[in-house]
Each structure stands twice: as C-alpha cells, then as structure tokens.
C-alpha cells in the first residue's frame, strides 16, 4: 500500500560544485568510526506549503545548494574503503525526488512512523555500500514537502548530521552564499587503529522490530522529577527521569523472570573535550550501568547508576583512549564477569533533546515535524523534543511480543501517551499544483 503512494520522479548523484583538492582526498576514519556499526542515522523534516516557493523549483534549488555545501562536507561525497578511510573522490551523494500521492495532513493522521517511512529513501539500510549519504525530497499533493536524510554512521554522529543540515539550509535560504566551515578533525582526536586489533562485537542488536512513539508532556516530566526528588535525587534532569522510567517499564515486561539488564547511553563529547559544535565526525562515547538488584525501587536507583556511569566516563576525559568503544566494551565485559552475569538484556539509549532540529529553515519556514526512523535496532530508546519543544517524544523499538506487553504497562500509560495513528490534525495551507 505504502509503495503505491510513492512515485519516483528522478534519481541522480549530486557532486561538490568544485573538486576536492588532492591533499584532502584521503579522509581517515577515527578509532570510533572504525568500531561503530555500519548503521544509518536518518531524519525526516516535514514542511508545510509556502506560496512564496514554487514546488517545481524546490528540487533544483536544493540540488544547487547541496552541491555547494558538499565542497565543505566533501567526505559525504566520497566512498568508504574497507574500514580504513574514505576516498574523497567526489562521486557524490544520491538525491531522490518523489511524488507522494496524498496530502501531508492525511498521511500524518496515519501516524508519524508511517509518514516518516514514506519520505525516507528505501535503500537507506544498505547506504554504506555506495553513497555515504542519501537525500529524498518528497512532494505531497497539498504542496507541502519533506526532506528525508540518511547518513552512514561511519561518517558522522547525530550532532554532525544536524550541523550539516543547518549549513545546507543556510546555503539554500541565504541570498549570498556563505561557505560552511566544519572542523573535520575526529581522526586527530581519536587516532585510527589497526583493523585487525579491533573487536567485532556490537553494542546493538539488529533485527526486525516494532517502532512506536510515546509522548511525555511537560506536566508528566515534572511529576517524574518530583518522584525522583522524593527518593533523594538532587536536581534530576528531564532526560534522566524519562530514560530511567522507560527502562524500568521495559524491564518489567520480563516479569516474573527478573532478568538483569544493562543501560548503555550515548554522550556527546564535544562540550567535555572543549570542542566547538561544528566539529564533525563521531565524537561521542557511551557509558553504562547494570541493574541486577531485582525490580524494587528501580527508578531512583537507575538514575543514580546512570549518573555514576557518566561520571566515571568523564573522569577519563584527559586520557582519551579510555573513551573509545574498545575500552568501554572491555569495562562492560569486566563488570559482567565480576557480577557473574552470563546474559542480560541491553537497552541502548540516546538523547537528541535540545538538538536545534526545529530551527532548520531552508527558506520556506521551520519544519512542523522532525522525525527519526530506526526500526531495525532492538531495544532502542531515542529521545527528542516534542514539536512544541516542552515535552519529550520517545521512539522505542522492541520485538513485537515485548512491545505488546510494554505498551499495556499501566504505570507507563499514566505518564506517557502512545502517539496514535490519528493525532490532532495539523493545519495545512491551500493546495499548490505547481509541481504537477
């Protein structure tokens, strides 16, 4: 059904508007790049119809500005050579333009996940095999558009992707082009290692899962904070309380087994390494905590354990080698051995809260919705600000059986609501036929 709604208009590769110098031809992967999974970070940006921009001209406008932006982000236009470096050969990024037969408002009523799936490139999971970045421009019948973006995690993290989109948007909206100035220095911060010495063990599990969204209002978040304070937690953050609460609810799905579990949380290292936000690459690490103490009073204990895990990671800032994937995996294995735990569930958590994704304006206004999509990662908890900016949306992916139990959890439903297939209608301006 969904595939019949999407009509491919064109496919092409966009190359940098000027050739990459020979001196920049080799882009070395950092040690974090080398050890990270070959997954894709994807985002979809939805924009309502703006009568000041003809739909038929938006494609050419975006292609032109993308070509200029790639001069600074030349690594995206290259090709991955084994697990060693990127050959910045200017072969380009794939740009797909499609027509979606339906109005944006009607499609969003069927659920954000459904709409997001439509506007992201269908080849997005196998991205790293050729193009390191794919863009899909989707035109809706109402004149609204969506820009779907997918980048190989071998090249960039979430912060890098947002910076790229901001620079591309600025290149599109400004009358005078201002060349972006990203800092491509990740390999100097985390020097590459011999591939033969690297572990192949993954911290995430890739399989078919269900993805659902749960929304926490400002009031619900404040109640969770108050609950944490009652248990002695000092100044709990919104991300801390939502993360701990969701992991607690997910773990309770396994009752009565009371299986131990780990929480692995990603952290942006730029502020802690005194790096500017325009430092591009995989500049993050992760910290973890293990809960093997049963199900009683998990909430406050989890927050404390998460804080301790993060503090332990940040104590290693000076000796950067202890921030790498390898060292953290070794530490996790060591802890499991000490606790005599042979197997456990693992929840992989990441927060994109406070990322300025709703400020990305290509010249036709800010997006009404920014949505990630990553349904192939088991037990993923991804947090984002709600479109209004005051609540939190949690994208949860689980196996189907576990998800069925999770969404019925009474405590969960008392603090969060499931993003239903019929959300409150968004007001879409009058229809634009200029693309036809």
Swiss-Prot record:
Transferase is among the record's keywords: yes
Principal cellular location given in the protein's record: cytoplasm
GO cellular component: cytoplasm; nucleus
Biological role: Component of the monoterpenoid indole alkaloids (MIAs, e.g. echitovenine, tabersonine, lochnericine, 19-hydroxytabersonine and horhammericine) biosynthetic pathway; MIAs are used in cancer treatment and other medical applications. Acyltransferase catalyzing the conversion of horhammericine to 19-O-acetylhorhammericine, of 19-hydroxytabersonine to 19-O-acetyltabersonine and of minovincinine to echitovenine.
Alphabetized Gene3D superfamilies for the sequence: Chloramphenicol acetyltransferase-like domain
Functional pathway: Alkaloid biosynthesis
Family label: Belongs to the plant acyltransferase family.
Active site per database record: 153 (proton acceptor), 361 (proton acceptor)
Membrane spanning residue stretches: none
Species this protein is from: Catharanthus roseus
Keyword tags: Acyltransferase, Alkaloid metabolism, Cytoplasm, Nucleus, Transferase
Reactions listed under catalytic activity: horhammericine + acetyl-CoA = 19-O-acetylhorhammericine + CoA; (-)-(R)-19-hydroxytabersonine + acetyl-CoA = (-)-(R)-19-O-acetyltabersonine + CoA; (-)-minovincinine + acetyl-CoA = (-)-echitovenine + CoA
A family per Pfam: Transferase
Induction conditions: Induced by jasmonic acid (MeJA).
InterPro entries referenced in this protein's UniProt entry, alphabetically: CAT-like_dom_sf (IPR023213)
Gene Ontology biological process: indole alkaloid biosynthetic process; response to jasmonic acid
Motif (Nuclear localization signal): 211-218
Oligomer status and interactors: Monomer.
EC number, UniProt record: 2.3.1.-
Gene (UniProt): TAT
GO molecular function terms attached to this record: acetyltransferase activity
Protein localization: Cytoplasm; Nucleus
Protein name: Tabersonine-19-hydroxy-O-acetyltransferase
